[in-house]
Amino acid sequence: MMKDILDVHTHTIASVHAYSTIREMAEGAKRHGMKLIGISDHGPAMPGTMDDMYFCNFRVVPREAAKGYGIDVLMGAELNVIDYAGSTDLCAKWLSYLDYAIASLHDLCITPGTREQNTSALIGAMRNPK
């Protein structure tokens, strides 16, 4: 049986539908034998989440909050694709503060398109340097 050693699609209390802090997530990861977690809160186009300045603070997030649990932490974002060209909701400046990014189509941020439009949007988002 395979064992998960990392999870990089996670949300903290900064995302409207999540309930844990970074420290609580590190505790849970340790309990499950993981080695790495990635914090990927939603970008600002998602209603009820943080604005872009939240991601600016990733330069100073105390990653050591998870070190006591033997867990490495990456700071990322779940970017919202906002058009069919693949534009996302964080500018290059804020993206530079991230370790990684996930691009997702959410119907709260973009009107669902055809299969071709959605594919074009995701391919465009993959051109992002993160």
Model-predicted regions and their roles:
Residues M2:
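Catalytic phosphate/metal-binding cores of nucleic-acid and nucleotide-processing enzymes, i.e., regions
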Residues I5-V16, I39-G43:
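Histidine-centered catalytic micro-motifs
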Residues H9, A29, A101:
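Conserved, mostly hydrophobic/aromatic
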Residues V16-R23:
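Glycine-rich anion/phosphate-binding loops
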Residues R23, E27, S120:
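Short, contiguous clusters of charged residues that form electrostatic/catalytic patches at enzyme active sites
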Residues A26, K30, M126-R127:
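Non-catalytic positions within long, well-ordered alpha-helices that form the structural scaffold/packing
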Residues K35-L36, S40, D99:
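Short acidic/polar active-site loop segments enriched in Thr and Asp
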Residues G43, P47-K130:
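Extended substrate/RNA-proximal surfaces in nucleic-acid metabolism proteins
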